[in-house]
Amino acid sequence: MSMLFYTLITAFLIGVQAEPYTDSNVPEGDSVPEAHWTKLQHSLDTALRRARSAPAEPIAARVTGQTRNITVDPKLFKKRRLRSPRVLFSTQPPPTSSDTLDLDFQAHGTISFNRTHRSKRSSTHPVFHMGEFSVCDSVSVWVGDKTTATDIKGKEVTVLGEVNINNSVFKQYFFETKCRAPNPVESGCRGIDSKHWNSYCTTTHTFVKALTTDDKQAAWRFIRIDTACVCVLSRKAARRG
């Protein structure tokens, strides 16, 4: 609104400067040429159109409707800042077999936030060659029943399960990776010298953009999801003889 105000003031000053001076060659009785006023009016109309078309709210304002009937503009999925390789909107469940699980699942009726080429990931991600082992066992799955999550501000929000895109109902999926064992095992991480190190496997998290609701307001928010299983180490205190 302030930009519109300054634009109007500038246009007004231009109009004032265009008025004929009493000591100029233009007779006092003559008016300002009609072409000038036409140009000035055009400038004002352009400023008004820009002010009206400018988004008055953040991107959340483009997500409209009730929590059970959210309609999303498909153009939003082309915005790079909203893309995430771990978020998928689809009318059908993504493949779950170990040889077909792909973050770029692009079957009919699917909209992925990620448009770049990525290698396929198995359900026991990562995959190692013979003789190689991971220090922690992990499992990766597409999660389509997430109802709540913690946003980047630490606040619990409701995750939208379904949205309307081009008059079709799309379900929101998240590709999550976590430790296979829900609790740390006594033996610790695989291959770690337990004589000198304490170790345990734990699930780590990251934040991705997702469609959520909070206080009946639908919006894109960063939410926390499981993304890896890592080994945590701490050196054992040396024993004194």
UniProtKB/Swiss-Prot annotation:
**A Gene Ontology biological process annotation?**
positive regulation of collateral sprouting
Q: Where does the UniProt annotation place the signal sequence?
A: 1-18
Where does it live in the cell?
Secreted; Endosome lumen
Q: Give binding positions for a 1-acyl-sn-glycero-3-phospho-(1D-myo-inositol).
A: 173, 209
**Sequence positions that bind a 1-acyl-sn-glycero-3-phospho-L-serine:** 209
Disulfide connectivity for this sequence is 136-201, 179-229, 189-231
Protein name from the UniProt record: Beta-nerve growth factor
